Amino acid sequence: MTGKPAYKRVLLKASGEALMGSQGFGIDVSVADRIANDIKQARALGVEVGVVIGGGNIFRGVAVASKGGDRVTGDHMGMLATVINSLALRTSLHKIGVDSVVLSAIAMPEICESFSQRQATAYMDEGKVVIFAGGTGNPFFTTDSAAALRAAEIEADALLKGTQVDGIYSADPKKDPGATRFDQLTHKEVLDRGLAVMDTAAVALARENNIPIIVYSIHENGGLADILQGKGRCTIVSDN
């Protein structure tokens, strides 16, 4: 890989569902290993990488609320699911020699370090992949919002959203074969059209901090490196 990367520091957001692979629940280790290899390729380009992973493959807090339970407790359970996923990705990274660390928004010192903005940026300056677990540490906020928040805190050049499809569409392309795919949008267009890429709080936070959002398929081998070199198929959300 000789192409010059377009970004020096990025925040990668991956859904928990991506880790399931073809399974209906949990973690497919082969998928975690493939994502780890994509991150290794990004590091080989000299790009500093932070990661936020959702927890939907294990638990969703809204599932508790939808059945009459306590949303706060449900969200706390979801935060713990993100820690499990983060530890799985760290394991996959370590297997291939990529130095990484998990920083949790919820203190659990026997398992991983607690998040601080200063420590996170210090680790990234050292070349470590930093995996941010525990969401924002607060209920009622999605891991998309956590990704936008961490991207702002580490001064990321871009927020990359690895999804099930190769960009943003006017409708779900799996349900609507006539859905239109966008190459480029502004943050305002995403918000005004209500396009399903990230929740509105995440898009608004990225917009306020002038962070472009790049949506691509996380299932393409080497896709992350291609995106970083400006070669991949994606949708870019930017006001510039």
From Swiss-Prot:
InterPro entries for this protein: AceGlu_kinase-like_sf, Asp/Glu/Uridylate_kinase, Uridylate_kinase, Uridylate_kinase_bac
Region (Involved in allosteric activation by GTP): 21-26
Record-linked Pfam families: AA_kinase
Top-level EC class as recorded in UniProt: transferase
Location (main, coarse): cytoplasm
Assembly notes: Homohexamer.
Activity-regulation annotation: Allosterically activated by GTP. Inhibited by UTP.
This enzyme's EC code(s): 2.7.4.22
One MF annotation (Gene Ontology) recorded for this entry: UMP kinase activity
Name recorded for this polypeptide: Uridylate kinase
Function: Catalyzes the reversible phosphorylation of UMP to UDP.
Family: Belongs to the UMP kinase family.
Species, as recorded: Brucella abortus biovar 1 (strain 9-941)
GO biological process: one example: UDP biosynthetic process
Cellular component terms per the entry's GO annotation: cytosol
Keywords: Allosteric enzyme, ATP-binding, Cytoplasm, Kinase, Nucleotide-binding, Pyrimidine biosynthesis, Transferase
Signal peptide: none
Residues where UMP binds: 55, 75, 136-143
Location in or out of the cell: Cytoplasm
Keyword hit for Transcription: no
Pathway(s) where this gene product acts: Pyrimidine metabolism; CTP biosynthesis via de novo pathway; UDP from UMP (UMPK route): step 1/1
List of residues binding ATP: 13-16, 56, 60, 163-164, 169, 172
